[in-house]
Design a protein with these regions (language model features):
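Active-site core of metal-dependent hydrolases
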Residues: 1, 12-14, 35-36, 40-51, ...
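His/Asp/Glu-enriched, well-ordered alpha-helical/loop segment
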Residues: 1-28, 32, 189-190, 270, ...
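Polyanionic/metal-chelating signatures
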Residues: 18, 38, 44, 50, ...
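C-terminal cap of metal-dependent C-N hydrolases
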Residues: 28-61, 204, 555-580
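Edge beta-strand at a domain terminus
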Residues: 39, 136-180, 184-185
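Tryptophan-anchored aromatic micro-motifs
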Residues: 60-79, 89-96, 102, 131-142, ...
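Histidine-rich, glycine-flanked metal-binding segment
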Residues: 100, 212-255
Length: 580
């Protein structure tokens, strides 16, 4: 069956089974010659024949060197035994003790090495019988050597009956020795996917992100992936209805899961910089569910992340929102019914400031050009919409005589923005560009949902609020390139004080595992309250992603995306004990 899967079956699928895929009279002379049985673990392909022409892959050793020899070297004589398989020879030198020898033969070129009391002896020679050559002793002296055969290797002779029995034998029985399988097939993969549990947390400090705030010595219950009760009284009413696993949270803190608004984990090669607009590409087509960073970020309390296209062009690709369901396939990682997003970008990256002298061709090359890319794209999208609108109004007979407009996946995505069906998250730094894009959006009839990074957001907070944009920034990143020199660690707190929905993001696989510490910096530098700072990585990114009705706080009916902390979640000394 395995052989047919490689030969006759694909030949049949390709419609060429009358000439290929089997060894029969009249078929094309395509076959391979092997050293051992076809599926032997140590088999080698010796020749590959294509249309009757042989191509040598691994030349077969012409001479069998196995046997008994005498080694003459430096005035001494030693017995030498060469054994093993023809393609994998072993040798032994016999003196007072038996010494293992490395013996390699490639046709008539011989290489020998062994260890004596002084170190390594290396010999190189040629021939069949005798073998002659030069070598270097362990003391560094060069000498000649001679190897003379005493007795050849006695091959096992098989009878005609034995050969016929082998040829006429039935199919080989393949044992299922693959062992246990898990997914992902990497470290920390599951043998069986974990089931949703009924869990009751008691005596724990709750960070609710609701009007109740932080509640000490409280309780919370979850069932079938949902929060079913919050608070001691509510839990008391239902504690006997289900078989809960009870977790004593004394001294511990329970919060909603961390949400990373800007991530690039579980992706690879998703910076389509070949053109100024690549809105047709989708991160959901490139997700790698076996990325170990999913597991690591779960260990840091992250439960949801928005996977973004890179920032190589003004209009990038479509985003993907995932839940960190380690061990699931791509479809199960994707967040159900999430509002679709697309990545935009401004600044040095899109005008190719640091791309080198050979990247001076693609438009735009200036910040002025970036603005025109946006206008050009959305004007084309509106014209595209008019063409399709006119086409849809035609009768069936008119459509037969006419020509249907060309389908454009790039413009389809931009149309979704104009119709309010898709949101934008935009890579941004400088106030002038942030202001420019808001003006473009206002004039074209759409809104920028999120300015991400936005390190000069504190300069344009009033205009952002008037436009209706949110902010997903870094806590204290600064001076890693020229356009971020005006960044300040107070930015997040100032934006929050202005009434703008503000979040902290990672943009980095390692940073995401410590987003709780990033949130703490809003308290340290900006004077934000602990509860507001905690919302920067939980409720506020949920609002920016339009999923706050399902997650981001501890409320009855919301998803049980939870993190149990060993201590205060904003402390650098606290660790994640459990993530749900």
């Amino acid at each position: 069956t395995a052989l047919r899967a490689l030969t006759s079956v694909p030949a049949k699928m390709l419609g060429i089974s009358n000439s290929y895929g089997a060894l029969k009279k009249g078929m094309k002379a395509n076959f391979i010659v092997c050293e051992k049985k076809l599926f032997h673990s140590k088999n080698k392909i010796l020749e590959n024949w294509v249309h009757g022409q042989a191509f040598e892959i691994n030349p077969k050793q012409e001479h069998d060197y196995r046997g008994s020899y005498i080694l003459k070297i430096n005035g001494d004589i030693f017995p030498l035994e060469i054994i093993g398989e023809e393609e994998n020879l072993d040798a032994m030198l016999i003196s007072k003790d038996t010494t293992k020898v490395s013996f390699a033969a490639e046709n008539e070129l011989i290489k020998i090495s062994y260890k004596d009391k002084g170190g390594i002896v290396r010999l190189s020679g040629h021939g069949k019988d005798p073998i002659e050559g030069q070598g270097q002793l362990s003391n560094g002296n060069w000498v000649s050597f001679l190897i003379k055969r005493k007795k050849g290797f006695e091959r096992e002779q098989k009878s005609v009956e034995q050969n016929n029995a082998f040829i006429n034998a039935g199919p080989v029985q393949v044992l299922n020795d693959m062992g246990e399988r898990w997914f992902p097939n990497t470290a920390y993969g599951w043998l069986e996917k974990p089931e949703q549990k009924a869990v009751l947390f008691k005596n724990v400090t709750l960070w609710t992100n609701e009007k109740e705030g932080v509640v000490k010595n409280s309780s919370l219950a979850i069932l079938d992936g949902r929060i079913i009760a919050v608070g001691n009284d509510a839990v008391e009413e239902i504690k006997d209805k289900y078989a809960f696993e009870i977790i004593d949270g004394s001294g511990k803190h329970l919060s909603s899961g961390i949400i990373d608004e800007h991530a690039h984990i579980a992706l690879r090669s998703v910076n389509e910089g070949s053109q100024a607009s690549s809105a047709e590409v989708r991160m959901s087509d490139a997700i790698r569910p076996n990325d170990i960073n999913i597991y690591r970020q779960l260990a840091g309390g992250v439960t949801i992340a928005q996977l973004l296209h890179g920032s190589a062009n003004p209009i990038g690709g479509q985003s993907a929102l995932i839940k960190m369901r380690w061990g699931s396939n791509v479809e199960d990682l994707l967040y159900d019914n999430a509002k679709p997003f697309v990545k935009f970008a401004l600044g040095e990256n899109v005008k190719q400031s640091n791309w080198g002298d050979y990247s001076r061709v693609r438009f735009p090359q200036t910040r002025m050009g970036v603005e025109q890319v946006y206008y050009d794209a959305f004007i084309r999208a509106k014209e595209y919409d008019k063409e399709w609108g006119a086409w849809r109004k035609l009768s069936a007979s008119q459509k037969k005589e006419g020509k249907m407009p060309r389908k454009d996946l790039d413009l389809d995505c931009l149309l979704e923005i104009l119709k309010g069906e898709r949101e934008i998250t935009c890579h941004s730094y400088r106030q002038s560009e942030i202001n420019m894009l808001m003006q473009v959006a206002d004039s074209m009839g759409f809104t920028i949902n999120t300015f991400t990074h936005i390190l000069e957001g504190y300069k344009v907070a009033e205009k952002m609020k008037a436009h209706g944009a949110g902010a997903s920034t870094f806590s204290d990143w600064w001076a890693y390139k020229y356009e971020v020199n005006d960044a300040i660690p107070h930015n997040g707190a100032l934006l929050n004080d202005m009434g703008i929905v503000t979040a902290f993001n990672s943009d980095d696989a390692e940073m995401a595992r410590r987003l709780n510490q990033e949130a703490a910096k809003a308290v340290k530098y900006g004077g934000a309250s602990e509860e507001d700072a905690w919302k920067f990585i939980t409720l506020n990114p949920a609002k920016l992603l339009h999923i706050e009705d399902k997650t981001g706080s501890l409320k009855k009916g919301k998803d049980a995306d939870l993190v149990l902390w060993s201590g205060h979640p904003l402390s650098v000394y606290s660790i994640v004990e459990q993530t749900y």
